[in-house]
Amino acid sequence: MRNTMSRLLPALLLVLALPVAAEVRELQWSDLIPPGAPPPPPPVALHDLSQLADALEAEAGPAAMQQSPAAPVVEALDDVQVKLPGYIVPLDMSEEGRVTEFLLVPYFGACIHVPPPPSNQIVHATSELGVKVEQLYQPFWIEGPLRVEHASSELAEAGYRMDAQKIYFYELD
């Protein structure tokens, strides 16, 4: 009986711990801004086609300045298992042509076609599996442990880091 109990107890503890370990908190971009901090400015949109030539010329120039490179972050999110939707801005690729290091941003074109959003609206992520380059024009869910940690890249400053354990297409429910 004692031998059976000594085997059963660790198994029971493991089963009870699984729901806690597997719990993933779904975040929205507003959750990355601390209460009382200023909201991010709206993204710059190019709706006037008469400005298209100027915009294309600006693409060839130096990168636009980031809106707030040291924006305040939410410390309580450190080491929380999360999932966050967004767009991928590639930083590094594998030999197989998959993006393995990237910035996750809230809207398409951020850091590339328009100035980068504040640092608390950018997550610097790495992934062993990566994402195919041809899939980068659509939004994704990124899932993994979020760290409140500053990261610099050639495109922007990020207020958060993540080891992206799961990457999958964003679909409306």
What kind of region is each of these model predictions?
Residues 1-9:
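Bacterial N-terminal signal peptides that target proteins for export
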Residues 17-21:
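N-terminal signal peptide c-region/cleavage motif recognized by signal peptidases
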Residues 22-173:
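OB-fold and OB-like single-stranded nucleic-acid-recognition modules
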